[in-house]
């Protein structure tokens, strides 16, 4: 008989109220997250999802004063009666604004910041810093300053900086907020790769559901008005109307299936476009719906407002950020 794992994060009848507010932001939270899981916590703006994350890493109530009720244990620690310092040894947090997390003058200094604070010997510090940088693919940028990095690269540095402590839990607070779709996919791929290599527990706080589902997650926890409305697998949640009912845009291919009149069930595996199971009747419905859509006629040649031809640019002579970019934008 397989022994059941104990949760690494456990909320029991938990609520949190900021000192400056009259009502609790979180109420009646019951949630268990197990070692090695990757869990997406989704919800519209103001739903309480970031407050929930702040309770896990200790920002609430130690940096943002407030009152906790119920119990919350994080890797065996009684979180509300602990400290940010103690919880930081268990939870590594990557903020939505990497600039607010950048401390060092260079990438290498920033990654090594926690090691310096713990008086790690120089030789060991260099080795750990190099290993963390290689893990996130930033090892060739250790001498770069913050302003020389893209948003995605800064996020990699932040991730490397929290990984030097070998934490068991990685928390990403809206990691896609400042990234374009392409960089967002790269960020999700990186999170997935790191989780597989290190077997850490990963929490992703995000409302851009389709982008997060670019790689698999074990569960989606839907939060709104400070309460947990759903705790399901992606396939289960996408076969309901809960996302749309609570202001979260479901993946566009799922919306297209609904418009075509397809009955979406968890058996159809709607969590990823490449895994969707459609029978012949479903395919016919989708094709008929697609062919019924009006085709926009070409308006002919338009006045060009912006035109770029073969543009290259680099912050340094040795590294080009843009290479032979050509584009035009019409009026």
Feature names for model-found ranges:
Residues 170-174:
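Catalytic Walker B motif of ABC-type/P-loop ATPase nucleotide-binding domains
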Residues 78-92, 237-238:
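ABC ATPase NBD coupling module
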Residues 145-149, 153:
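Conserved ABC ATPase signature
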Residues 57, 92, 99, 105-116, ...:
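Short helical segment in ABC ATPase nucleotide-binding domains corresponding to the A-loop/adjacent helical element
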Residues 162-163:
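ABC ATPase C-loop
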Residues 123-141, 306:
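Conserved ABC ATPase "signature" region
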Residues 225-226:
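Conserved ABC ATPase "signature" C-loop
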Residues 65-77:
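Conserved ABC transporter NBD signature motif
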């Amino acid at each position: 008989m397989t022994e059941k794992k104990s949760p690494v994060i456990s909320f029991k009848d938990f609520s949190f109220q900021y000192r400056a507010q009259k009502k609790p932001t979180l109420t009646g939270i019951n949630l268990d997250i197990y070692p090695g899981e990757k869990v997406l916590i989704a919800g519209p703006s103001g739903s309480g999802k970031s407050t929930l994350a702040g309770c896990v890493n200790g920002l609430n109530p130690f940096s943002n004063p407030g009152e906790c009720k119920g119990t919350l244990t994080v890797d065996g620690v009684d979180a509300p009666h602990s400290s940010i310092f103690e919880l930081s040894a268990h939870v590594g947090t990557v903020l939505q604004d990497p600039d607010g997390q950048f401390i060092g003058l260079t990438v290498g200094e920033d990654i090594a910041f926690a090691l310096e604070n713990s008086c790690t010997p120089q030789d060991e510090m260099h080795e750990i810093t190099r290993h963390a940088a290689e893990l996130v693919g930033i090892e060739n940028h250790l001498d770069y300053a913050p302003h020389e990095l893209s948003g995605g690269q800064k996020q990699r540095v932040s991730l490397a900086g929290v990984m030097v402590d070998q934490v068991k839990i990685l928390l990403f607070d809206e990691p896609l907020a400042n990234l374009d779709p392409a960089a967002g996919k790269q960020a999700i791929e990186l999170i997935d790769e790191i989780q597989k290599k290190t077997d850490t527990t990963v929490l992703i706080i995000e409302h851009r559901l389709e982008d997060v589902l670019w790689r698999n997650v074990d569960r989606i926890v839907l939060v709104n008005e400070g309460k947990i409305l759903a705790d399901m697998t992606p396939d289960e949640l996408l076969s309901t109307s809960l996302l749309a009912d609570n202001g979260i845009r479901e993946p566009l291919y799922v919306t297209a299936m609904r418009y075509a009149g397809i009955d979406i069930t968890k058996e159809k595996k709607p969590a990823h476009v490449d895994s969707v199971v459609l029978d012949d009747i479903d395919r016919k419905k989708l094709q008929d719906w697609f062919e019924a859509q009006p085709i926009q006629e070409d308006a002919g040649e338009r006045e060009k407002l912006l035109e770029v031809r073969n543009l290259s640019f680099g912050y340094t002579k040795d590294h080009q950020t843009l290479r032979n970019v050509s584009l035009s934008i019409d009026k």
